[in-house]
């Protein structure tokens, strides 16, 4: 099992003990069955094994409060599949857990992991034009705005040499 810690959070890979939480949290558009959740978990575990130093394949971690380490409150990770040659940071928090600084803690710890543990050369991220909370997360994590998307969103980056732990 993989686990990263922040001040308030545990970011970790999920296990079969977390199937009920996957069912509860993977609720779009109409939810998933326990069997589908088992398939999701199997995919997460397969992807985790494919990550190598300098080459993230896909890392999806459950976000847990340290005070409630069994309840998933969000997802975060690093993706190397969607944009080949890039490592992309992602995060999403359950609505009840937003505006608490949790996404910023996730972003900072994932950047540390990408640069210090996985030797990535850079990490990218983006948000929609109306998602200013996510824009601020990337700013607070130290990422630099580099361009606008064709739909008016924002593209951010951080190079390894610019990372400060």
Model features per residue range: what roles?
Residues 1-33, 47, 57-165:
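Acyl-donor (CoA/ACP) binding surface of acyl/acetyltransferases
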Residues 36-57:
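Active-site rim helix/loop that mediates acceptor-substrate recognition in acyltransferases
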């Amino acid at each position: 099992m993989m686990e990263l810690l922040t001040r308030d959070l545990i970011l970790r890979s999920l296990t079969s003990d977390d199937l009920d939480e996957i069912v509860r949290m993977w609720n779009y558009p109409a939810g998933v069955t326990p069997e589908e959740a088992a398939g999701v978990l199997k995919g997460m575990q397969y992807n985790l094994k494919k990550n190598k130093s300098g080459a993230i394949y896909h890392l999806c971690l459950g976000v847990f409060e340290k005070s409630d380490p069994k309840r998933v409150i969000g997802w975060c990770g690093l993706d190397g599949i969607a944009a080949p040659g890039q490592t992309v940071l992602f995060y999403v928090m359950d609505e009840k857990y937003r505006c608490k600084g949790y996404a910023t803690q996730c972003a900072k710890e994932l950047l540390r992991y990408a640069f210090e543990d996985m030797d990535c050369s850079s990490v990218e991220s983006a948000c929609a034009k109306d998602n200013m909370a996510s824009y601020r997360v990337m700013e607070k994590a130290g990422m630099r705005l580099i361009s606008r998307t064709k739909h008016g969103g924002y593209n951010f980056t951080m190079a390894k040499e610019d990372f400060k732990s």
